[in-house]
């Protein structure tokens, strides 16, 4: 087929493959806080496998390491707890409310 007859074909873009977050030399361990902290959200939650871009086996090891670190008090269970602030409340109306019929 001639190229002029295919008006809607897009050229394929090249893309750069991302580096894996865990290198081959990295050891997933509860004491390796610099590695573990990359897989925790700001609230202290364990990030999902899709977000982390790791394999299933690596995600399992990360989860176990994070849980062990939490139990041994190396990591907090929760971080950035919301501070409840009292906001200015609106004053109540003192008049009786009547229903219109």
From Swiss-Prot:
Keyword Plastid: yes
Compartments, record wording: Plastid, Chloroplast
This protein's UniProt keywords: Chloroplast, Plastid, Ribonucleoprotein, Ribosomal protein, RNA-binding, rRNA-binding
Region of interest (Disordered), ranges: 1-23
Top-level taxonomic group: Eukaryota
Primary site of residence: plastid
InterPro entries: Ribosomal_bS18 (IPR001648), Ribosomal_bS18_CS (IPR018275), Ribosomal_bS18_sf (IPR036870)
GO molecular function: small ribosomal subunit rRNA binding; structural constituent of ribosome
Coiled-coil residue spans: none
One term under GO cellular component: chloroplast
Complex and partners: Part of the 30S ribosomal subunit.
Designated name of the protein: Small ribosomal subunit protein bS18c
Species classification: Eukaryota, Viridiplantae, Streptophyta, Embryophyta, Tracheophyta
């Amino acid at each position: 087929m001639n190229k002029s007859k295919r008006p809607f074909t897009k050229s394929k873009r090249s893309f750069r493959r991302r580096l894996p977050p865990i290198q081959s030399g990295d050891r997933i361990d509860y004491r390796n806080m610099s590695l573990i902290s990359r897989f925790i959200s700001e609230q202290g939650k364990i990030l999902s496998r899709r977000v982390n871009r790791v394999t299933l086996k690596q995600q399992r090891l990360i989860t176990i390491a994070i849980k062990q670190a939490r139990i041994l008090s190396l990591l907090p269970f929760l971080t950035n707890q919301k501070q409840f602030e009292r906001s200015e409340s609106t004053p109540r109306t003192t008049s009786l409310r009547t229903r219109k019929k």
